[in-house]
């Protein structure tokens, strides 16, 4: 949600701070997650034969760009958003640090590293602009406690709950398990690339410290029981290998057996509650837990040995070597915590449910193709860990948003906003303040509710969108609650509009990142843009380019297992109504971005409770 907001803040901050201080440092720094930045070691590997064919051309173009880039940000930065779409899907991702494989000071590019430069610059800055998830991940896993910010402002504060929800989640899935295997064992023999297992990364330590070497060997041997390449194919053919693949196979079978959609949701993931489990599945879960425990113990032992090597350092251990071992220790700690969370999740399968958590099985699918199977756990109230990890150590935290409070007939509902801020968990009474909007919505906006388009009538829905776009002469933002309907409407009307000189762009159809799509939309007043949730929040298109927002239906929350649990805890239909009101307010907020803006807000719903 926040890429557009980060660009906006970077532009606005230029009015308050100079580009650089007298000593050359930047007072304002944009900081993103590691997976957004170009990794120079991955680029070097790609240039030296890691990428072949068309992908090698991408590597050459990225190398040219890297020489001139402001900060090396490949996702939503100054790399053209369309470039990656001309090459294979994973091309851009393969050049970033997606998998926690960084060797820190052991890297020959450490001093020039874009990620490290951003981290060093943010330590000196007055203002660090980052997204919610990065702030939480750094608080939970940051290497240097002294560098953590003490005063935090969460803009778009209504997203903090969702960001905390995903940050403090646990998921034991096939994809996560195979990543752990690759981190410990290294890549499969036939794969290219510079990925190394533990043995290669810590070869010098293993040869110097016998106990450390034995721990590395034990961890690698135990990790061979994790899923390997081709695991999904083996499960689909009924031939799983190893304790975890056996477990995922049983999870998949049970999830399909309990699927209540009757094949209606063939293109989407399916899930089932963890209740009344067959004895065989519980037995498989215990075997999988033993396999995970066999990996965790040598990793803990290895962490202790690395600490001992640092304390009683040998003569050959220079500065970069010490930093590399520090980095390895940090990465080990993260994996040990992950394994402990997975073991706790598996122990729960045979026992009573924990009222603080919501657990479920899921088979993830995209366009009817399975891509992951696993066991998921979320906090019922994710603000509890958020309060402990982020709020408690901070000196001051501010949450700001136009939709923090729910608007009811009695006025603003501060009680719910305070609950969702996490403040009650640290027993602090927060200060609250509200400001009136500077815009005259009554005079500048008109709301239309269209009730004669039946739900599921795609030809009528597409016809309505085409008529609205033609009547407005472009400048329409269309928001959908389902990707399938978005694609169907786009397919029916794009040609018709193009013939009228009205270009139409769509998320999930045009292979361009959302930030670039919004830039194209902003620059062409005849263009229209169709999108989903990500466009409902944080998109800033002032002026003539956005004159009409069309909502394809009431934005009901999806009735997932997690949503049902929170709905039961949060007051039933009141909980749903609160979510819908906030989503409508956010969607309406896209329309009026300045005092001269005006336009229409249209909802297409036969059952809209107006």
Task: List each model region and its residues.
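Conserved RecA-like ASCE P-loop NTPase motor core of nucleic-acid helicases/translocases
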Residues: 1-2, 398-400, 475-486, 603-604
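A substrate-engagement module of RecA-like helicase motors
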Residues: 3-126, 182-256
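A contiguous, basic/glycine-rich beta-loop/short-helix subdomain that forms a polymer-engagement track
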Residues: 93-123, 136, 141-143, 302, ...
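Residues immediately C-terminal
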Residues: 135, 159-162, 166, 405, ...
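SF2 helicase catalytic motif II
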Residues: 148-168, 172
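Conserved RecA-like P-loop NTPase helicase motor core
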Residues: 441, 446, 450-456, 509-608
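Conserved interdomain hinge at the start of the Helicase C-terminal
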Residues: 449-481
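Conserved helicase motor "Helicase C" RecA-like lobe of SF1/SF2 P-loop NTPases
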Residues: 483-508
């Amino acid at each position: 949600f926040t890429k557009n907001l980060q660009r906006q803040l970077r532009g606005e901050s230029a009015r308050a701070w100079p580009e650089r201080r007298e000593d050359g440092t930047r007072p304002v720094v944009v900081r993103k997650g590691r997976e957004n930045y170009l990794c120079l070691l991955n680029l070097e590997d790609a240039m030296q034969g890691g990428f072949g064919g068309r992908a090698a051309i991408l590597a050459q173009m990225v190398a040219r760009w890297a020489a001139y880039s402001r900060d090396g940000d490949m996702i939503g930065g100054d790399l053209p958003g369309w470039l990656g779409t001309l090459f294979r899907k994973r091309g851009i991702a393969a050049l970033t640090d997606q998998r926690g494989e960084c060797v820190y000071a052991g890297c020959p590019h450490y001093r020039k590293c874009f990620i490290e430069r951003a981290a060093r610059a943010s330590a000196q800055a007055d203002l660090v602009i980052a997204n919610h998830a990065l702030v939480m991940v750094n608080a939970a896993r940051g290497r240097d406690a002294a560098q953590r910010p003490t005063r935090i402002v969460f803009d778009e504060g209504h997203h903090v709950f969702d960001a905390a929800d995903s940050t403090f989640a646990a998921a034991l899935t096939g994809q996560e398990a195979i990543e752990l295997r690759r981190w410990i064992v290294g890549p499969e023999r036939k794969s290219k690339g510079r990925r190394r297992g533990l043995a290669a990364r810590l070869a010098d330590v293993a040869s110097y410290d016998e106990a450390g070497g034995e721990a590395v060997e034990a961890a690698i041997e135990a990790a061979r029981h994790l899923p390997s390449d081709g695991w999904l194919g083996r499960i689909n053919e009924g031939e799983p290998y190893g304790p975890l693949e056996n477990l995922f196979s049983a999870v998949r079978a049970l999830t399909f057996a309990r699927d209540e959609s009757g094949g209606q949701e063939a293109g989407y993931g399916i899930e089932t509650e963890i209740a009344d489990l067959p004895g065989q599945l519980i037995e498989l879960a215990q075997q999988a837990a033993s396999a995970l425990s066999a990996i965790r113990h040598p990793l803990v032992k290895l962490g202790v040995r690395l600490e001992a090597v640092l304390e009683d350092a040998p003569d050959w251990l220079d500065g970069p070597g010490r930093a590399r071992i520090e980095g390895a220790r940090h990465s080990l700690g993260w994996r040990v915590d992950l394994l402990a969370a997975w073991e706790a999740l598996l122990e729960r399968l045979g026992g009573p449910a924990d009222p603080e958590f919501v657990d479920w099985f899921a088979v993830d699918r995209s366009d009817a193709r399975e891509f992951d199977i696993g066991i998921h756990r979320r906090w019922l109230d994710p603000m509890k860990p958020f309060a402990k990890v982020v709020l408690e150590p901070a000196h001051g935290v501010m949450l700001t948003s136009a939709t923090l409070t729910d608007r009811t007939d009695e006025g603003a509902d501060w009680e719910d906003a305070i609950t969702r801020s996490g403040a009650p968990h640290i027993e602090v009474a927060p200060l609250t303040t509200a400001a009136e909007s500077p815009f005259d919505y009554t005079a500048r906006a008109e709301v239309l509710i269209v009730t004669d388009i039946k739900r599921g009538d795609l030809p009528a829905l597409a016809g309505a969108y085409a008529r609205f776009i033609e009547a407005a002469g472009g400048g329409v933002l269309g928001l959908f609650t389902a990707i399938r309907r978005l694609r169907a409407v786009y397919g029916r009307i794009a040609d018709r509009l193009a013939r009228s000189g009205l270009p139409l762009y769509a998320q999930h159809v045009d292979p361009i990142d959302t930030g670039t799509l919004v830039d194209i939309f902003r620059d062409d007043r005849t263009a229209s843009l169709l999108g989903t949730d990500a466009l409902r929040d944080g998109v800033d298109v002032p002026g003539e380019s956005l004159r009409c927002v069309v909502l394809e239906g009431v934005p009901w929350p999806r009735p997932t297992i997690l949503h049902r649990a929170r709905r039961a805890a949060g007051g039933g239909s009141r909980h749903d109504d609160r979510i819908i009101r906030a989503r409508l307010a956010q969607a309406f907020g896209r329309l009026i971005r300045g005092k001269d803006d005006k336009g229409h807000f249209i909802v297409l719903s036969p059952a809209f409770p107006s």
